[in-house]
Amino acid sequence: MKEVIHSTLAPKAIGPYSQAIATNDLVFVSGQLGIDVSTGEFKGADIHSQTTQSMENIKAILKEAGLGMDSVVKTTILLKSLDDFAVVNGIYGSYFKEPYPARATFQVAKLPKDALVEIEAIAIK
């Protein structure tokens, strides 16, 4: 059985996908851009603003599922530039405590809406 998770405190999906899907003991959060739900636009044009908003969007979606950031077991970070790796790490690290989730980070040629970062997460109930 699967359940759609949708938070009004995070932006709507920009394509044919759900913000998150819960199934059995897992919640799969789709990639989140740094879009501010109140404006529908990026929180800012810089990596700091976009990363922070991406993480806040994940946090809001998890909250809708009754979970917190401490439930996250795996993340994937997509970056327009690996030059932003240190900044993203600093912000990312402020959302988690040890033991940190497993993670993969990739540089990609382009992200939706020309975003600088996209972050997806898997959490356990």
Swiss-Prot record:
GO cellular component labels: cytosol
Single GO molecular function: deaminase activity
Q: Which PROSITE patterns match?
A: UPF0076
CDD domains reported for this sequence: YjgF_YER057c_UK114_family
Q: Which Pfam families match?
A: Ribonuc_L-PSP
Q: Which family does it belong to?
A: Belongs to the RutC family.
Q: What is this protein called?
A: RutC family protein jhp_0879
Origin organism is: Helicobacter pylori (strain J99 / ATCC 700824) (Campylobacter pylori J99)
Upper taxonomic lineage: Bacteria, Pseudomonadati, Campylobacterota, Epsilonproteobacteria, Campylobacterales
